């Protein structure tokens, strides 16, 4: 019998540094990578493109069931492909981010995408980036990490990111948006944003990304007995 491929789940709120950490770990271990948040963003973008009501679970479920999404790693970057088109940049807008959080609250939408996410589990292993990877999608994962940071730090990081891309932003407005999204994600009835009981909680507020990567890899290798 073929052994099931191992999974390292990285959960946490937006802006904690999950994406950077997951790419670094996938590269270090030479494993596959799943950006679960991107799947919800792709669904949200598809809904916006096809004028599907974001508040209608009945309308979103068929779209989720037939969503054509692929992840392609090229030169260290993760390309998100929707219906043959690279939408990596388009799904990172604030409009799509807010819409993704909205559609993710529907139980049947999550069920429709659950099977897609689990299908990414292939040898030699998978790094799964998301919000409920360790609690819902891969509850049997041998390594679970919950990456967190203060809302102020995450707002600051997001502000710098937007400014680097030429956008003018208001810190207080950004902070309020993040706190509102946190409240919605942490308190929703289905798959709320909480650490798995057996997860390592890693606070990145006062850590450099290099320190976060080092701590996460050390923990993962210890748990997996990888040299």
From Swiss-Prot:
Which Gene Ontology molecular function entries are recorded, alphabetically?
A: ATP binding; CMP kinase activity; dCMP kinase activity
EC number, UniProt record: 2.7.4.25
Q: Mainly resides where?
A: cytoplasm
Quote the gene name from the UniProt entry: cmk
The cellular location(s) given in this protein's UniProt record come to:
Cytoplasm
As its record notes, the protein acts as a catalyst of: CMP + ATP = CDP + ADP; dCMP + ATP = dCDP + ADP
Q: Name one GO biological process term.
A: pyrimidine nucleotide metabolic process
Name-wise, this protein is Cytidylate kinase
Q: Which UniProt keywords apply?
A: ATP-binding, Cytoplasm, Kinase, Nucleotide-binding, Transferase
A cellular component annotation (GO) from this entry = cytosol
The record's listing under InterPro entries reads:
Cytidylate_kin (IPR003136), Cytidylate_kinase_dom (IPR011994), P-loop_NTPase (IPR027417)
> Does this UniProt record's set of keywords contain Nucleotide-binding?
yes
One Pfam family matching this protein: Cytidylate_kin
């Amino acid at each position: 019998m073929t052994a099931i491929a191992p999974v390292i789940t990285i959960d946490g709120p937006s802006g904690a540094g999950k994406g950077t950490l997951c790419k670094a770990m996938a590269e270090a271990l030479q494993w596959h990578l799943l950006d679960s948040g991107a799947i919800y963003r792709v669904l949200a973008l598809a809904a916006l493109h096809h004028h599907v009501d974001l508040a209608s679970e009945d309308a979103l479920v068929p779209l989720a069931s037939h969503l054509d999404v692929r992840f392609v790693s090229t030169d260290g970057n993760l390309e998100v492909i929707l219906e043959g088109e690279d939408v990596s940049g388009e799904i990172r807008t604030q409009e799509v981010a807010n819409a993704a959080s909205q559609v993710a609250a529907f139980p049947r939408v999550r069920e429709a995408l659950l099977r897609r996410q689990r299908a990414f589990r292939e040898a030699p292993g998978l790094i799964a980036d998301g919000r409920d990877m360790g609690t819902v999608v891969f509850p049997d994962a041998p390594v679970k990490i919950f990456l967190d940071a203060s809302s102020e730090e995450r707002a600051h990081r997001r502000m710098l990111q937007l400014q680097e891309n030429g956008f003018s932003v208001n810190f207080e407005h950004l902070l309020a948006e993040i706190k509102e999204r946190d409240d919605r994600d942490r308190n929703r009835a289905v798959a709320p944003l909480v650490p798995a009981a057996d997860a390592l909680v890693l606070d990145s507020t006062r850590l450099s990304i290099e320190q976060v990567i080092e701590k996460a890899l050390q923990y993962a290798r210890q748990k997996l007995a990888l040299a």
